[in-house]
Curated annotation (Swiss-Prot):
Family: Belongs to the group II decarboxylase family.
Reactions this protein catalyses: L-dopa + O2 + H2O + H(+) = 3,4-dihydroxyphenylacetaldehyde + H2O2 + NH4(+) + CO2
Cofactor dependency: pyridoxal 5'-phosphate
PTM-bearing positions, type N6-(pyridoxal phosphate)lysine: 232
Keywords from the named record: Catecholamine metabolism, Cuticle, Lyase, Pyridoxal phosphate
Protein name: 3,4-dihydroxyphenylacetaldehyde synthase 2
Single GO biological process annotation from the record: catecholamine metabolic process
Functional note: Involved in cuticle development. Probably responsible for the protein cross-linking during the development of flexible cuticles.
Highest taxon in the source lineage: Eukaryota
SUPFAM superfamilies assigned to the protein according to its UniProt record, in alphabetical order: PLP-dependent transferases
Pfam annotation, one family: Pyridoxal_deC
Active site: 121
Organism encoding this protein: Drosophila lebanonensis
Gene it is expressed from: amd
EC number: 4.1.1.107
Length: 439
């Protein structure tokens, strides 16, 4: 990603990852089961446990521990969320059919409902469309955080109406402002109503590895599944999204479609999973190889340093914003994202962005919250530097100065035009009055 691309969350890349991608392409493995490529499956088990320990996730998400939990590499957060939604849906259908045999499957499916925040990513709403299950986007609080109280209120209303709550998708690092939903309070409600809780930590998950960001991990021991994009913070190129499940059997049981040509004598063993049951497609790429090479080359401290660099550079940009009275923050800086706007009407911010896009020196996108238009500045690039931040801020400040000067000039011209018009009208009236007196 170019260092002056600040519109979206970063898409990482590194030379070790590129080498791993090239090797994986050369091997051309379609690792849907252990028997077709033991190395593909076993290396993925290893790196997913490495990553879980690196991010300090609860032990029940590790393959190495006793229990049905484990991790798998999906292509994207969209795939991971869809897998969670589909698995939760099938589990709910089975559970309700067992307790209410008088209901038909179609009756049950027509009553299913899911929940997320109105600040969540579009892929969550799309997962509901693909799963034929409505996802209600609950209003986040003034601080952009979804809490258990809002979820409880929605579930109570739906249960009273005869609906069946299925899953809640919480977000750690929302797309608009990088807000963090209150996972702990959401988990309390989900446990009470037997609702699957999934956490989409596509961006913020990289900060789990930092001791200073330990608060982000609060409540993760209570969730059923979570995902994190390695291609955002971990210097692994797209596509590569890690997903962990507390009980992988719930996904396997929901997606298991066997054929005789797919069976082998080792299937069913917990230490050698057939990952085809953990995902949407049958075939799968050897993504674990680029993760393994990147981790081995850069090391845990190298990856932590990369995340910290993004955070420090965002702090630098935040200082620039706070020091300029013409700008204001819309939300607190979060990790490598700063949300800000030009003070005044939304039109000023919109015109500022238009000028920046026309000049093509930096790239940003706009977002909106509570009727306020704002700009998102995300630190990006394989090796971002302070000079990149300074360049971007200089460009933004210069263009706002030019925009305000242009508006002042137009306003002055408008006032001058009004005065001229009034003078002409007044002069015409004086002339007419003089002529009448002469006559």
């Amino acid at each position: 990603v170019p260092p002056h691309m600040h519109g979206y969350y970063p898409t990482s890349v590194s030379y070790p990852s590129i080498v791993g991608e090239m090797l994986a392409s050369g091997f051309s493995i379609i690792g849907f089961s252990w028997i077709c490529s033991p190395a593909c499956t076993e290396l993925e088990v290893v790196v997913m446990d490495w990553l879980a320990k690196f991010l300090k996730l609860p032990e029940h998400f590790l393959h190495a521990t006793e229990g049905p939990g484990g991790g798998v590499i999906q292509g994207s957060a969209s795939e991971a969320v869809l897998v969670a939604v589909l698995a939760a849906r099938e589990q709910a259908v089975c559970r309700v059919r067992a307790s209410h045999p008088e209901l038909s499957e179609s009756d049950i499916r027509g009553k299913l409902v899911a929940y997320s925040s109105d600040q969540s990513n579009s892929c969550i709403e799309k997962a509901g469309v693909l799963a034929a299950m409505p996802i209600k986007l609950l209003p986040a609080g003034e601080d952009l955080i979804l809490r258990g109280a809002a979820l409880r209120s929605a579930i109570e209303q739906d249960v009273t109406a005869g609906l069946i709550p299925v899953i809640c998708i919480a977000t750690l690092g929302t797309t608009g402002t990088c807000a963090y939903d209150d996972v702990d309070s959401l988990a309390t409600v989900c446990e009470q109503y037997n609702v699957w809780l999934h956490v989409d930590a596509a961006y913020a998950g990289g900060a789990f590895a930092l001791d200073e960001c330990s608060e982000l991990r609060r409540g993760l021991e209570r969730v059923d599944s979570l995902n994190f994009n390695l291609h955002k913070f971990m210097l692994v190129n797209f596509d590569c999204s890690a997903m962990w499940l507390r009980d992988a059997n719930k996904v396997v049981d929901s997606f298991n479609v066997d054929r005789i040509y797919l069976k082998h004598k080792y299937e069913g063993q917990t230490q050698i999973p057939d990952f085809r049951h953990w995902q949407i497609p049958l075939g799968r790429r050897f993504r674990a190889l680029k993760v393994w090479i990147t981790f081995r080359t850069l090391g845990a401290e190298g990856l932590r340093a990369h995340v910290r660099k993004h955070i420090e550079l965002a702090k630098k940009f935040e200082v620039f914003v706070l020091a300029d009275a013409r700008f204001e923050l819309v939300a607190p800086r979060a990790l490598g994202l700063v949300c800000f706007r030009a003070k005044g009407e939304n039109e000023i911010t919109a015109q500022l962005l238009q000028r920046l896009m026309e000049r093509k020196k930096i790239y940003m996108v706009k977002a909106e919250h509570r009727g306020q238009l704002f700009l998102r500045f995300a630190v990006c690039g394989m090796d971002p530097k302070p000079s990149d931040i300074e360049f971007a801020w200089t460009e933004i400040g210069t263009q706002l100065t030019a925009l305000l000067a242009e508006q002042e000039h137009l306003a002055a011209v408008g006032k001058a035009g009004d005065v001229t018009e009034l003078t002409q009208q007044f002069g015409l009236q004086l002339t007419n009055g003089t002529n009448e007196k002469s006559q």
